[in-house]
Amino acid sequence: MGEFERRNGETDGKTGGETKKYFSYAAAADHSLKGRWGLVRGRTRWLAAGVLALGAVIGGVLWRLEESVSAAAPAPAGLEVRWIVDAGHGGEDGGAVSPGGMVESRINLEIARRVDGIFGFCGEPALMLRTEDISLHDPEAVTLREKKASDLHNRAQTASEYPEAALVSIHQNMFQQSRYRGTQVFYAPTQGSQELAQAIQGVVRESLQPENSRESKPIPSTVYLMNHIPNRAVLVECGFLSNPEEEGLLQDPKYQTKLAAVIAAGCLGGSSDLT
């Protein structure tokens, strides 16, 4: 379940032009933004195909990644970090739990690793905020609430050290009714975040989920991380753990790689227009 849902007590079971109880969505983009997005779409069509093919190769070797890296991975030495990959939740804060018992934080980490791997193969310096299924809280934090607050503060602090990098936060969705499915991208209030979210949402629809009619939407102010960093930032709800079919897909390594590939393609296809 996405961080914003748990804090608001509202889940994303609505699509298209529907609205939630706790916040309203932004109006449709103006003509200039639509024109800009059209250029991004044109480039991402071919880029998505290439990254999807690359993702298939990467998926076969990701399990060989070194397991001894620290929980909060250091920035690549001598390189300017362009992307920050955030696997949502972790440790005691597992996030949502599917009807079959699958914990969200583990799926988030698997997809985030793949996104990071694709960035690496494409020569895009990236930093993962966590590389293990643990919380990033300070040792002084004792209660679950203290640990969660400390964890989010530390993630925000790390991201803020690289203000020119864009943050991509990976989460999973949850709803009381099982029929809802599909990827949904939310964006931070910082400049360039909306365009980045639109690029990712567009590639998802064109390359992986043609039936997905969702549009990218603004993140509510209650989501701490996305509202306490200077970076361009998006939160990607990859799918619904409450949907039996999608629950199975989200646990499939091949599908995780496809998701990572379209997320990376959206980022890379739109990045030059967003800097």
Model-derived segments and spans:
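Catalytic-site microenvironment of enzymes
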Residues: 2-275
